[in-house]
UniProtKB/Swiss-Prot annotation:
Entry annotation: catalytic residues: C334, R440
Alphabetical GO biological process terms: GMP biosynthetic process; GTP biosynthetic process; self-resistance to endogenously produced metabolite
Region feature (Disordered): 506-527
Subunit structure: Homotetramer.
Name of the protein in question: Inosine-5'-monophosphate dehydrogenase
MF terms (GO), sorted A to Z: IMP dehydrogenase activity; metal ion binding; nucleotide binding
Gene: mpaF
Cofactor: K(+)
Coiled-coil blocks: none
UniProt organism field: Penicillium brevicompactum
Enzyme class, UniProt record, top EC level: oxidoreductase
Description of how activity is regulated: Mycophenolic acid (MPA) is a non-competitive inhibitor that prevents formation of the closed enzyme conformation by binding to the same site as the amobile flap. In contrast, mizoribine monophosphate (MZP) is a competitive inhibitor that induces the closed conformation. MPA is a potent inhibitor of mammalian IMPDHs but a poor inhibitor of the bacterial enzymes. MZP is a more potent inhibitor of bacterial IMPDH.
InterPro entries on file: Aldolase_TIM, CBS_dom, CBS_dom_sf, IMP_DH, IMP_DH/GMP_Rdtase_CS, IMP_DH_GMPRt
Binding site for K(+): G329, G331, C334, E511, G512
Subcellular location: Cytoplasm
């Protein structure tokens, strides 16, 4: 008969057990015993809840220098991230990586749009001259997706301020050939150079103007402040911004020498982080490119990859990488593992590379294999600082391309892997030059293109302004269940064995999903 113990001694009796319930992460991922695992093959065991989900911080480093407030990145794929996605990912606390399957000038223009979108003091505003026509002002409004352009004597910064042309001034003006001086507002509220951002915000707040020009003692325009940016600061408190209040922006380049010119254009446009994009990151080409970037642009942080082993990581860290991108063949539109017989299951990859990179203070990004919110949490638990998403974001409003109705009657958007034949043979986006898909997979000179990806479609997910907050809230609740209040505590708990894991059999995976119902509706979130 089992002895019934004093219930008040339960916590003391628990200490008699040699280890916590479940498995240590190293036991979980011991591939010698049970093969390498991926996200569906395990669960994280719950801990103790002593705080609210709202108190969970998701601040994380994506490179040695840059920290974001939501551990989420959008992939540099031509059906996922252009300037609209990059802007909204940054506003929501993450980071968008603009793809490079386009001419360098087009990519630089996208970077420029991100950097202009939200600012404190706008140090390089779009300035009009007295000879600019109303029609030209309308074209600029369409191009930049904002209005309120200062007009100066020379049409440049550091020139005498004459007025401001607002959207209302030009919207219904019937003679487009008129100069903007005929419609501009001259009743201006300005602030003197040297005004602090807080003081300037207060002047703008108390005025009824949309823009606040900052002028020097001679009345020359030196910068601009926007009321719409104040509203963005209220609506997007997690925004990934620099001290200058500009949004953080990343963009991809290939390992080819020709992209050195591309990178110069991106840097001139204001780029913060460059992602050296390759399907197999441990190459002489990428190592040479990293070293060149470090010597030429020391203020630009480099995310290198993709890799799946410690050996690959060591080579890129030694070359100077500031962050690592993990994943090979695990993406939803990727067939590298099937075709090349090269790669690694994503859970094993993330743990191996992240544990090694952490010893050098290099953050890692789990890229690929993410099918749902739970996979994001598992990637973070295995040591990644952030998770990169492709197909999860491809169906959102902010991704490139138009919606269409599938044969099944669903609203979908096109999505294609960068290793697909559709991308490798697409000369349109690349401007007839080198193709980013072929470059990524070292196939640009091949007579026979071997696909390492597929093209397809993904179901409409709505706007990321709703979807990303759902992901953020879900990660916070998950960390609350695990019993850790931030990502550093999660990583520490996993490493010291306090955060435990359990493997899942096929039956366990079935049990952990919806089962036994006649029918159901799977609505993931409401807002």
């Amino acid at each position: 008969m089992v002895e019934i113990l004093d219930y008040t001694k339960a916590l003391e009796v628990l200490k008699e057990y040699p280890s916590g319930d479940g498995l240590h992460v190293d036991t979980l991922l011991d591939s010698d015993n049970h093969g390498a695992l991926t996200y569906n093959d395990f669960l994280i065991l719950p801990g103790s809840i002593t705080f609210s989900a709202a108190d969970v911080s998701l601040d994380t480093k994506v490179t040695r220098r840059f920290t974001i407030k939501a551990p989420l990145l959008s992939s540099p794929m031509d059906t996922v991230t252009e300037h609209n996605m990059a802007i909204h990912m940054a506003l929501l606390g993450g980071l968008g990586v603009i793809h490079n399957n386009c001419p360098p000038d087009d990519q630089a223009e996208m970077v420029r749009k991100v950097k202009r979108y939200e600012n404190g003091f706008i140090l390089d505003p779009v300035v009009l001259s007295p000879s600019t026509t109303v029609a030209e002002a309308k074209e600029l409004k369409t191009k930049w997706n904002f209005g309120g352009f200062p007009v100066t004597e020379k049409g440049t910064l550091h020139s005498k301020l004459l007025g401001i042309v607002t959207s209302r001034d030009i919207q219904f003006h019937k003679t487009p050939e008129d100069p903007v001086t005929a419609v501009m507002s001259t009743d201006l509220v300005t602030a003197p150079a040297g005004t602090t951002l807080a003081e300037a915000n207060e002047v703008l707040r108390s005025s009824k103007k949309g823009k606040l020009p900052i002028v020097d003692k001679d009345g020359l325009l030196v910068s601009l402040l926007s009321r719409s940016d104040l509203m963005k600061n209220i609506h997007y408190p997690l925004a990934s911004k620099l001290p200058s209040k500009q949004l953080l922006c990343a963009a991809a380049i290939s390992t080819h020498d020709a992209d050195k010119v591309r990178l110069q254009k991106l840097v001139d446009a204001g780029l913060d982080i460059v992602v050296v994009d390759s399907s197999q990151g441990n190459s002489m080409y990428q190592i040479a490119m990293i070293k060149w970037i470090k010597s030429t642009f020391p203020d630009i942080d480099i995310i290198a990859g993709n890799i799946v082993t410690r050996e690959q990581a060591a080579a890129l860290i030694a070359a100077g990488a500031d962050g690592l991108r993990i994943g090979m063949g695990s993406g939803s539109a990727c067939i590298t593992q099937e075709v090349m017989a090269v790669g690694r299951p994503q859970a094993a990859s993330v743990r191996s590379v992240s544990a090694f990179a952490a010893r050098f203070g290099v953050p890692t990004i789990a890229d690929g294999g993410v099918q749902n919110l739970g996979h994001i949490v598992k990637g973070l638990a295995l040591g990644a600082s952030a998770v990169m998403m492709g197909s999860l974001l491809a169906g959102t409003t902010e991704s490139p391309g138009e919606y269409y109705v599938s044969n099944e009657g669903q609203l979908v958007k096109a999505f294609r892997g960068m290793g697909s034949i559709a991308v490798m043979e697409d000369k349109g986006k690349s401007g007839g030059g080198k193709n980013a898909g072929a470059s990524r997979y070292f196939s640009e000179n091949d007579k026979v293109k071997v696909a390492q990806g597929v093209a397809g479609s993904v179901v409409d997910r709505g706007s990321i302004t709703q979807y990303v907050p759902y992901l953020v809230a879900g990660i916070q609740h998950s960390l609350q269940d695990i019993g850790v209040q931030d990502l550093e505590a999660l990583h520490t708990g996993v490493n010291n064995g306090q955060v435990r894991f359990e493997m899942r059999s096929a039956s366990a995976q079935t049990e952990g999903n919806v089962h036994g119902l006649h029918s159901h509706e799977k609505k993931l979130y409401s807002s």
